[in-house]
Amino acid sequence: MSKYLLAIDQGTTSSRAIIFSAQGLPVARAQQEFKQYFPQDGWVEHDGQEIWLSTLKVCREAIASSGLQAEAIAAIGITNQRETTLVWDAASGTPIHLAIVWQDRRTADYCAGLKDAGHEAMVSAKTGLLIDPYFSATKLRWILENVPGARERAQRGELRFGTVDSFLLWRLTGGKVHRTDASNASRTLMFNIHTQQWDQDLLELFDIPASLLPEVLDCAAEFGHAEAELLGASIPVLGMAGDQQAALIGQACFEPGMVKSTYGTGCFMIQNTGDQPVSSKNRLLTTVGYRLGGKVTYAVEGSIFVAGAAVQWLRDGIKLISHARDSEALAEATGEACGVYLVPAFTGLGAPYWDPKARGAIFGLTRDTGIKEIVTAGLQSVCYQTRDLLEAMRQDGAAAPSALRVDGGMVENNWVMQFLADILGVSVERPEVTETTALGVAYLAGLQLGLYPDLQAIASHWHRQQRFEPRMSETHRERLYAGWLDAVKRVRSEG
């Protein structure tokens, strides 16, 4: 009997479920967007109940549309938007506050105070991360400080903390299991990536009770069983990874030096660094790539907060386009030398700048500037930010990759992929299956199930759909990029 794997891909703007065959081919999928809440400048929230209900709905829809019986699903894998923070009642499973999303910057002043007090060196040495509102610890502390009675309830053991994966696992198992995986734990600012444990010094710094925290397992492990009444059968959850680490696996970047870049709401470039953590001198992050059989593979990551979100803003915020797909034709009609630079620092700048107080701007406007130039500049901003990350990796001593493997919704845009190759001066490879985040966590579940004997078996399923080669002259490339660097300098809060 064929084995099928259900991947839950809970993202920043939508929840998706994809059923894969053992060969890594999508059989059925379902997707549902959910509401974004922006209560104040720099604040971004989600409703945990909406996350759960949308996830349950797409799982049921995917199973129904596949024509399979629920019993044919051999295992579930969960991948998720990372860092987003939930705290819920241990008895009812009800969140005590809206989820604070990874993009949220409300703790910027608190983070600045920790840096001024000299704590960043210790935090970075233990976690591989920087002190920044992006990560979970300061979000969790904010909830404990600002929800009436939360800290007292946490100290009494009545509350649970989790990133989205942990919350979904709790709900799927009927509140029986409170676990996460090493890749998600490594993004909280509370997890020591060397000891692979929650760190007491960090918990004391952020004033977090240890009773809130989930158990940390490998990325392929026995996480628990989804209750039969939810999906029609009791299905084991055997894989779990943060979305970017899952994409690293889905892209089969198993050798040190291999690089993938995912283009969703944000953009995330990860380079496999092997069994040793590599510290960046250029404000990139050291993180857990994946942990299998107790063995950690580390990675260096650059995180950009706004990629696809820039196109979403062009569509929904200022309504220059009706559909995201319209952007490709407009860019083709404009060309790469549009003279306009859009810096989408809507919630600050991520790597390598880490400037939470920077704000977005458009430069180079003339009387002739129209919709197509601004839309093109929005697309180009994603590629320029990717170049920023690649430059930081090069300055850290990494060799230029022979190719950049790309995935995520934006990579369907051929114009963006060609401009990306041009501005990087590196070949860009788009795989046949671009849902690599979901595919990666399906592979993890399959690995635990025994469908795949090892990572090499998974790598054999990776196939390239198209390769984009650089066509731009170096002179033109560097002139365009210099204009971008000038634009970024102008929006920096430090000037």
Curated annotation (Swiss-Prot):
Q: In which pathway does it act?
A: Polyol metabolism; glycerol degradation via glycerol kinase pathway; sn-glycerol 3-phosphate from glycerol: step 1/1
Key word Membrane present: no
Q: Which GO terms describe its cellular component?
A: cytosol
- Its top-level enzyme class, in one word, is transferase
Listed binding positions for glycerol are R82, E83, Y134, D243, Q244
Record entry for activity regulation: Inhibited by fructose 1,6-bisphosphate (FBP).
Output one GO BP term.
glycerol metabolic process
Q: GO terms for molecular function, please?
A: ATP binding; glycerol kinase activity
Q: Any stretches that span the bilayer, and where are they?
A: none
- The record's EC number reads 2.7.1.30
Residue positions annotated to bind ADP are T12, R16, T265, G308, G409, N413
- Positions annotated to bind sn-glycerol 3-phosphate: T12, R82, E83, Y134, D243
Superkingdom is Bacteria
Tell me what reaction this enzyme catalyses.
glycerol + ATP = sn-glycerol 3-phosphate + ADP + H(+)
The alphabetized UniProt keywords are: ATP-binding, Glycerol metabolism, Kinase, Nucleotide-binding, Transferase
Q: Which InterPro entries match?
A: ATPase_NBD, Carb_kinase_FGGY, Carb_kinase_FGGY_CS, FGGY_C, FGGY_N, Glycerol_kin
Residues recorded as binding ATP, renumbered to this chain, are T12, T13, S14, T265, G308, Q312, G409
Entry-linked HAMAP family: Glycerol_kin
Q: What is this protein's function per UniProt?
A: Key enzyme in the regulation of glycerol uptake and metabolism. Catalyzes the phosphorylation of glycerol to yield sn-glycerol 3-phosphate.
Family affiliation: Belongs to the FGGY kinase family.
Q: What is this protein called?
A: Glycerol kinase
- As recorded in Swiss-Prot or TrEMBL, the protein's gene is named glpK
